[in-house]
Amino acid sequence: MQQRRPVRRALLSVSDKAGIIEFAQALSARGVELLSTGGTARLLAEKGLPVTEVSDYTGFPEMMDGRVKTLHPKIHGGILGRRGQDDAIMEQHHIAPIDMVVVNLYPFAETVAREGCSLEDAVENIDIGGPTMVRSAAKNHKDVAIVVKSSDYDAIIKEMDANEGSLTLDTRFDLAIKAFEHTAAYDSMIANYFGSMVPAYHGESKEAAGRFPRTLNLNFIKKQDMRYGENSHQQAAFYIEENVKEASVATAQQVQGKALSYNNIADTDAALECVKEFNEPACVIVKHANPCGVAVSTTILDAYDRAYKTDPTSAFGGIIAFNRELDAETAQAIISRQFVEVIIAPSATEEALKITAAKQNVRVLTCGQWAQRVPGLDFKRVNGGLLVQDRDLGMVSEAELRVVSKRQPTEQELRDALFCWKVAKFVKSNAIVYAKENMTIGIGAGQMSRVYSAKIAGIKAADEGLEVKGSAMASDAFFPFRDGIDAAAAVGVSCVIQPGGSIRDDEVIAAADEHGIAMIFTDMRHFRH
């Protein structure tokens, strides 16, 4: 039999009061004595619940503007006291056992995220008594239940009803794990905030730290275990951030298909992040984290058809992302034409899901619509360390472009240049993208020399019978030599968009002028390693 402990006395002190009234009512109805503090106590009293203020319970007043409320032996002795071992000392000092602690902490993250938050505001939102009670109760989980998540309230009441007012050791242990995770995340936020105020170390430089803390503490929640990692001999799991603010693969709901693999998730992320770059109906097909076909059109059906034409061979077994709802006609076109691992879209119609259901192995994800891109951090693990940088949300507007060639681009060339520049951002370096009339016609990815990426893009276009003449070419970084321009000219490219910045820019521009190519500088690089 599970080691059960009855809940006879509970201390409730929460900043997030969602569901606390109903939970307290349920506890009280089951004969549980309620202790509480400050605003929580007032709220429960207003609802007619029999609640004892902690200051009345301890005989010691709340003081220092609420800084000292629960830091008292009668509270922590009641929480930490070991049943059957500390009973005599507890009785000697008139300490009653507290069987449940319900606490969530001051909203530090929300406070420091507010514009204009001062250090003083941040300091006053560092909870002291709350984490102390949480850790005390979690340490003594053998006898005490610690509740830090409102999502657990209903399950706790159901278990108490099933066990004559008691909770099992398994439940208390699980709640203790959540509690330690909660306090660890809380302390990490505080450490990161204060650590970002410490001057950075840039070799011998004494420049300001920016927003990167001295010690980086990360907290991610396990969403699922994977069958294996990138390869079958590697174990893996998928962890996500808490309260993700942007539609993503982490927030997506799987509505059908086999369990997602490690590679599925990585490739789906690449496809979804690329398709977010476009306002018009768009389709992105990804294979091994590289786009192999991208197009925009008036409908996602036509966008898919055009994206597929870029490289049908690579599209086999790929990931397909849309920035509009998946409809039945598009779903039918995909299922009839190709084998696909994952389809992700903001939503899907019932008719579309009926069609994809015919292929049960196809994974269909809906992620919700995104209103904006949210700044954040990207991480790259190296042996013994972690590289951290801002997400690459950089993009240039038409007004920011610099035409450096003698010939100006036509309106269509400019549209194609901006289109393939958006795609190049998501292709592994060295990246070259050919595009014409809002679709990719050749992609050269991941080559050690830029000229070979340019040649590969031309070869792929020729293999699929796509017309390169009059197309635009995007390069994720500058051309170190003119050879990339010569390769593009040889297949008929008429416009090139690139960051610029090479010591041989003059030679590269001269090559463009020699071939009658319009050349645009963005002054922004998009390396992707």
Curated annotation (Swiss-Prot):
CDD domains recorded: IMPCH
InterPro entries: AICAR_Tfase_dup_dom_sf (IPR024051), Cytidine_deaminase-like (IPR016193), MGS-like_dom (IPR011607), MGS-like_dom_sf (IPR036914), PurH-like (IPR002695)
Keyword tags: Hydrolase, Multifunctional enzyme, Purine biosynthesis, Transferase
PROSITE patterns assigned: MGS (PS51855)
A single GO cellular-component term on record: cytosol
One annotated GO biological process: 'de novo' IMP biosynthetic process
EC number: 2.1.2.3, 3.5.4.10
Top-rank lineage group of the source organism: Bacteria
Pathway it works in: Purine metabolism; IMP biosynthesis via de novo pathway; 5-formamido-1-(5-phospho-D-ribosyl)imidazole-4-carboxamide from 5-amino-1-(5-phospho-D-ribosyl)imidazole-4-carboxamide (10-formyl THF route): step 1/1; Purine metabolism; IMP biosynthesis via de novo pathway; IMP from 5-formamido-1-(5-phospho-D-ribosyl)imidazole-4-carboxamide: step 1/1
Stretches assigned to the MGS-like domain: 1-148
Family matches, as HAMAP family: PurH
PANTHER family: BIFUNCTIONAL PURINE BIOSYNTHESIS PROTEIN ATIC (PTHR11692:SF0), BIFUNCTIONAL PURINE BIOSYNTHESIS PROTEIN PURH (PTHR11692)
Name listed for the protein in its UniProt record: Bifunctional purine biosynthesis protein PurH
Lineage of origin: Bacteria, Pseudomonadati, Pseudomonadota, Gammaproteobacteria, Enterobacterales
Gene: purH
